[in-house]
Structure formats: structure tokens, C-alpha cells
Amino acid sequence: MNTKQYNTKTYVLTALFAALIFLVTAYVLHIPTPATGGYIHLGDAVLYLAASILPTPLAVAAGGIGEAMSDAMTGSVVYAIPTFLIKSAMVLCFASAGKKIITKRNIAAAIFAGVICVGGYYLTESILYHSFVSPLVEIPANLIQAGSSAVIYILAGNALDRANLKNRISLTEMRG
């Protein structure tokens, strides 16, 4: 029976993606939204890349940890656990199998992940604010974040596909 085992390079790449997701979310183009204390960022674009490159369980770990750490480190601690859950669910939309990052399925996944993001934070804020009305003010900012992250993901993914990235790295080894 063949079992899939991740090599050291896969774990290192997972840690690098977690760190990159954290940095891009917390510090690169970090735009606060005063209405709710949240912020707009492009970390989801890196999350989508991780989800398209890494094996799913490791992409879930990298995305959830990186995004939750950014909330914890930038003063949005109350969102850290919901962020871990929401971002982990977003990763599950993507497929890392195949030789390309940008596929029709992954483009659709970016859109669906955006819906999960907007809906997840609406539900989170509804619980935190004890209201289904007040979180409506955050939806436009979440839509901007989801849309801009999808565009950046597609542009970066196409560039990495042209560089033949997925064929240059081997993230698993087969053991019998």
C-alpha cells in the first residue's frame, strides 16, 4: 500500500507560506476600517496561492495560522479564532493537484472563498455585536478585500505558472 508522506521541503514551504500570509495580512497594504475595527488586506491572495500549491491539510494550517496570527498581533484578538476557522474553510475551496496554479476551478474557488469570507465575518460580527444589522456596514470592505485578493491571486498565479513553478517543486514522496 502506498502512503503519501510530506518531505522536509513541503513543511518548510508551509512555514514560509504561514509567515508570508501573516506579513502580507498584518503589514503590507493594511488599511483599517474604523466602522468595525477590522482592516482590508491582500493576505488572502497569498492564502489562495498556498491553497493552490500546498497539499490541502498543510494549506489549511498555513492559512489559518498566518491569518489568525495577524489578527492577534494587530489588535484584533477577538477575531483570531473566527479568522482561523473562516480562512481554513476558504482554503478548502481550492485544488492543489495538477500542474497549474490558475485553473478554471481555482478561479471559481477564489470567488466562492470570497463569499465564505464575507459571510463568515458577517456571522462573526453578528454574534459579537448581538445584531444582524450593524455588521452590514462591513460588507463593502470585505467585498473589496475579497475582489482585490482574487485579482492579485490570478495575476501572481499566472506569473508563477509561466515560471513553471509547480513542475519545479516536488512536495511529496511516495513510500511503499
Regions found by a protein language model. Name each.
Residues 1-176:
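Loop-helix junctions at membrane interfaces
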